[in-house]
Amino acid sequence: MIDITHKPTTLREATATALVTVSDPATITAVQEKRVPKGDVLESARVAALFGVKKTHELIPDCHPLPIEHAEVGFTIGAQEITVTMRVRTIYRTGVEVEAMHGASVAALTIYDMLKPIDKGVAIGGIRLAEKK
């Protein structure tokens, strides 16, 4: 792990996104109407994203354990896609970019897992860091 003891403690922010696409608009309708057999897709993905952010250092070898001061996840629903937006903030010596991307990824995987029984064409793509401060 890189030595960060010499770095100053400052406000660190990162926003990441992930895109989940579906093959049938009826899948999006099922999500919106909470008719997916496995349960409430967006609430499950929200909880999973928060767990993902908090556990990043346990799964990514060179990530430091750091205090997560704020984490929020949002969902933008389109005709055949759901965009996950994950924002993370801390006051620490290192950034939270990987934590934000990990949270967005875990949310996307949760959505995928919950939708695969009703839509065999679900796909995840476009996981990226949208902003870093």
Q: What does each of the following model-derived ranges do?
A:
Residues 1-64, 69-133:
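C-terminal binding/interaction regions
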